[in-house]
Structure formats: structure tokens, C-alpha cells
Amino acid sequence: MIWRLALSESALCAALCLALTRVIMDLSLPEWVADWAREAPKLVAPAPGPISKQIIDKDRKYVSHAYDRLFQFTMKKSSGASIMDADGNVYLDFSAGISVLNAGWSNPKVVEAIKEQAELLVHSLANDAYFDKEADFAELLAKISPGQALGSTFFGNSGAEGVEAAVKLSRYYTKKGEHIVFMGSYHGRVGNALAMASRVKYKYGHGPFPPGIFFAPYPYCLRCWFKQEYPSCNMLCVDYLEKGILEFGGPSNDVASVIVEPLQGEGGYIPPPKEFMPRMRKMCDERGMLLVADEVQCGLGRTGEVWECNSTGTIPDILIAGKALGGGIPLGAIVAKHSVMDVWRPGSHSSTFGGNGISMAAGLAHVREILEQKLPERSRVLGAHALKRLQELKDKYDIIGDARGKGLMIGVEIVKSKKTMEPLYVPQMQGIAWRKGLMMITAGMFGNVFRIAPPLIISLEQIDKGIDIFEESTKEMQALLK
């Protein structure tokens, strides 16, 4: 009885907090969002419709089949948190283009910045000359870096390029050649980044891979590698890294860097315990290794912080950014301490399109919009509401094994039953939700985690609408398993 009373008081408190927040913070859609996008989801024809099908047929003939193509429709236009296909169907997007459009699809500030820059200078030749927006953007990134301690930026074209740059820089700085990464990690699909991926799906048929990369267990507490429970485990996974892998497991004294996602993305949207990142910092300091934070997916407001490192006060030596950095235009970067970045001499690293005119204009406008519209704070509020609702669904449905996350970076883990916690591969359930008008993408080492990662400008009403559809899809999927 006392437990039920406490639960009801907690629910009442959460409701009152949300009501108060709605008075202080406008949780409706921005005014610029198109009228058609406000109606999402709105399905007018079975997908793929005739126009989409024509384009899909041509695509299958001429475009590489390497892409997953999860959704069988052709995108036509977008606005806010909605996408319209070529046949007029409007979908509610819970993916933000894989955490790219944090300030919303077709944000007018970004669109206008692209148009203005295209009329002035498309390609900035940043490798051989100077460009004002590149300097402006680097200055902004220095000012918003963790602890304002990372003062120098190198721009590339993607998060994966950022990883490659971080690997090169850490080796150049330390004069060492090995790296520690984590089980469940994802850092890209080229070169060293691919070697650091932990899913066979991405690596199959592409070896051999560069040597000197060692995998440590990430604190995936739901499926602890050591069958322990947090916090009584005392972070055994970190002890294993320090005392097992580093001292006895293989690496010599030649480890240049520890490359880690402060909140693991592709591995299943896994927030580690709060002491994990500070322990990584301490370990790196004691052993002369650089700490590299891969914030490609979790950065720029996604978790309720500008950078997820900020949540634990951890200052990395190098931070990798991408995805949302460009506002929809290809862009990646490493932001590093001057003491680290400044060891590179002219010509040590380069990129033909790094610092490109269009990407600098778009990225600068997008990051400014994230900051000016206080989207990290908005993500924190909407994410708390979404996570509360999803955890209630977890208590209600046997196939929801976990709901976890920070801000609007939430993972919902689907299982065959809570009794066994055996992962349930979810493309079928993903299709059920899509046919109801909700776009979600998946993650997880077992392909059983839904990412709840909409644009941060999404409204409270749309969050609830999407979760309602998710519940309907869960109910249907659970019935199919009986």
C-alpha cells in the first residue's frame, strides 16, 4: 500500500513538473513547421505507392544494394519532425535522420544559410586558403567544448573521418600505435573505424583489419558481461580493462588512446553508470593515454546536454563530432586540446572538402539554432516525459525488456519474454509501426533495440502520438508471438 502511494505521489509530481515546464517552456512545434507536417502521421495510400515504386525500381537497378533500405517509400519533402513520401503519405519521424536533424527537418535558418552561402562560395578551398565561416565555426566549437578546454578543430566530411583523424592525431601525439575500444561500439565503416566496430555484420568480408585494436566490455548493465549487478559490481568491467586487458591481456605500453562513446549508440542506446567516464579519464591520465570521446551520435543536445561528456564533468583530450554537426550537410570534426592538436605540422593531415563553404554555413547555422532555441534543455524535458511513458509500457508488456536513455536518446529493448530476456529481432515490429505512420530505426548488438531519437524540436503532442503508435505496435507484436 505504501509502495502504491509512493508511486502515485511520484506520478503526480512528474505530472505537476511537466505542467509547470509547459508554462515556462513552449513544447509545441515551432511556427516555421509546415501545416502538412503538423498532421503526421497521415497515410493516404498503401506504401510504396505508384510514384515511389517507379523510383524504387530504378534505384534497385542502378544504386548499390549495400544500403539496408528499411522503409519502402521515396522521400519527397520534410519539415519539423515529419517526412512526406512521393505519394503524399506523411510519417512521424522518431529517428531525426539517425540523429542528424536535431533542430528539425528543413529548419529555415539552415536552409537560408545554405542558399546564401551557395550564392557566394560553394567550395572554400580550406586546405590552401582561409575562410571566415570555418574560423567562426571553430571558435564556436571551442567556446561550447567540455570545460571550454578544447580549443582547436579539424573539419572533415563525416563522423567516420573524424574517427580516422582522431586515431592519426593520438598516434602522432603519443608516438604510440594501439587503441582501446569497447564491445558494442560503432565508429564508422572505413579503415580503423571499421576495425573498431564490434558487429560481425559490418566487418564480414572486409578483412584483414589493422592490428593494435583491443576490445573492452562496455558497462551494458542489463546484459552484464560478468553476470553482475550494478552498483554492487563496483564497475568490474572497468577493473577488467585496467587490470586484465591493459596489464595482462595483450596491449603493450603502446596504447595511444581509449576511444569511447559517452553514451553508446549503435550498441543499443546504453547510458553507462555516472562514474564510468570519470574513471576513463583517470585511467588515461595515469597511463599516458589520450581519452577520445566519440560524440558523433550523442552530441549537440541529443542527451539533454550540449555534449554528453558534460553530464559527468569529463573533459576528453579529443572530441569527435558528426551527424548533427552539419545540419543535414555532410560534416565531421575533431575538437582537441591545443596541446594535442598543435603537434600536427602543416600537411600532417588534410581533406579536400574539409571546411567546405556549404557545410560550414549549414553547420554553423544548425549549431547556433540548437543553442539559441535551448534544444538541449528541451530534449531533457521531452526525454524525461517519453522515458516515463516507455517505462510504464515496459511494466505492461512482456516483450519490452528495458527502456533507458537520457534526453531524446532513448533505447527500448525488445525481448521474447522477460523471463528469458532472449533478444527479439525487430524488423517485423518496425514494419508494423511504419505502416501506422511511425518511423523508427533500430540498434543493439542483437538488432533488438528501438531508438527513440526524434528531432529535438518535436512537440509534446507528437511525442505522445508516437508512443501511442509504439504501444499499438507492441501489442500486435506480442500477440503474434503467442
Each model region followed by its residue ranges:
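Low-complexity intrinsically disordered segments
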Residues: L18-R22
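Conserved N-terminal phosphate-binding loop of PLP-dependent enzymes in the Aspartate aminotransferase
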Residues: D26-K482
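Serine residues within intrinsically disordered or low-complexity segments
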Residues: S8-S10
